[in-house]
């Protein structure tokens, strides 16, 4: 076996082992995320070892033919499963995750097809002299691999968009890099760099996902306060509008229905805010029952506010205890962020007073009708 390839495989396995330990010891990943990354890293390591075995036993005495066949079968069969394990770590609410079970079924069907065609050498063959060769339908393996990578790319971009992640476009060059490397490997099979590249990209994917999740508020899925503070520094230069939201009488919800129901209310309100504003700006939870949105311009402000109230009213038909939400806004005009926030807060408090006065007037009107 080529010493260069042996060194690459050793580096590959060391990196994967390190990533497994890092994943297991992580305090920021949940159980599902840990499981997905651990399975992906372990599977990549196993396939890397299988590739070493195929190279060692290829051309060896015919007694090793069974090992050559088995190693190639498992290597070609399990390769498309690597992107599936990486999709598994993504948020379960993502639309693209709904077809995950179908993708797993496709992988199972592919494994059965590969096993059934072994005697005919359609995808690959190992001669009686124990020599490996690609089959006439080797492209089926290539198609499965590219389809799995495409699925991972689309799933990640969709999830990143749902999480309002600004770096989601970085997924495209990563996918293109792996696709180009695969083409080179197909054209020059003696290089044996595929799994080193897959390992590199899986590590980058781990970093990308960790960064994406670290920007989120765990309860609501909106961007968190740290993201807000970093973004407002940019808004001071580029301009825009700060919209702040406060949940009316939220303490009463917690006191009357408990904190679990209060958390449900916050999650529902956050979802409505994101649906109303996400296309025009970035949505944040900056503490307790306080939310804010950084809009790119003032033109969409009124329309988004109207949409939010409509969404809340619709959601309140199902979840009756959902409280009202007051909002205030202020435009960035070059001054300090604190000053902009102060103006937005003053507008918010004025809106809350108007909301309370309106609610009191409606209650008084209802009481008058009952008395009459």
Kindly label every feature range from the protein language model.
Residues 8-62, 68-85, 103-121, 170-186:
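Hydrophobic alpha-helical transmembrane segments of multi-pass membrane proteins
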Residues 24-37, 88-100, 157-167:
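Membrane-interface helix-boundary motifs at transmembrane edges
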Residues 155-157, 161-219, 226-240:
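Signal-transducing coiled-coil linker helices
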Residues 275-280, 304-322, 350:
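Short catalytic/binding micro-motifs of nucleotide second-messenger systems
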């Amino acid at each position: 076996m080529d010493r260069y390839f042996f060194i690459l495989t050793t580096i590959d396995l060391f990196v994967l082992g390190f990533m497994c330990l890092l994943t297991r010891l992580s305090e920021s990943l949940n159980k599902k995320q840990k499981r997905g990354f651990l399975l992906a890293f372990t599977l990549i390591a196993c396939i890397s070892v299988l590739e070493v075995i195929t190279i060692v036993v290829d051309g060896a005495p015919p007694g090793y033919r069974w090992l050559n066949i088995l190693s190639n079968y498992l290597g070609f069969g399990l390769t498309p499963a690597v992107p599936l394990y990486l999709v598994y770590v993504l948020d379960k609410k993502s639309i693209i995750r709904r077809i995950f079970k179908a993708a797993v079924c496709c992988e199972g069907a592919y494994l059965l097809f590969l096993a059934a065609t072994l005697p005919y050498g359609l995808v690959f063959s190992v001669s009686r002299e124990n020599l490996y060769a690609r089959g006439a339908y080797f492209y089926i393996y290539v198609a499965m691999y590219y389809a799995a990578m495409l699925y991972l790319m689309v799933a990640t971009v969709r999830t990143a968009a749902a999480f309002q992640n600004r770096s989601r476009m970085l997924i495209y060059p990563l996918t293109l890099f792996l696709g180009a490397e695969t083409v080179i490997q197909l054209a020059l099979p003696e290089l044996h760099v595929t799994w080193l590249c897959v390992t590199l990209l899986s590590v980058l994917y781990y970093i990308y996902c960790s960064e994406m999740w670290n920007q989120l508020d765990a309860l609501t899925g909106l961007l968190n306060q740290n993201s807000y503070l970093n973004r407002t520094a940019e808004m001071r230069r580029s301009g825009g509008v700060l919209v702040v939201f406060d949940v009316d009488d939220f303490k009463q919800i917690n006191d009357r229905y408990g904190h679990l129901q209060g958390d449900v209310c916050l999650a529902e309100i956050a979802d409505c805010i994101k649906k109303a504003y996400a296309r025009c700006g970035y949505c944040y939870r900056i503490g307790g029952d306080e939310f804010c949105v950084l809009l790119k311009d003032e033109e969409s402000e009124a329309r988004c506010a109207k949409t939010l109230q409509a969404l809340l009213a619709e959601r309140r038909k199902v979840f009756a205890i959902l409280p009202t939400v007051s909002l205030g806004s202020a435009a960035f005009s070059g001054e300090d962020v604190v000053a902009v926030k102060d103006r937005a807060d003053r507008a918010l408090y004025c809106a809350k007073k108007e909301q309370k006065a309106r609610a009191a007037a409606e209650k008084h009107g209802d009481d008058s009708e009952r008395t009459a």
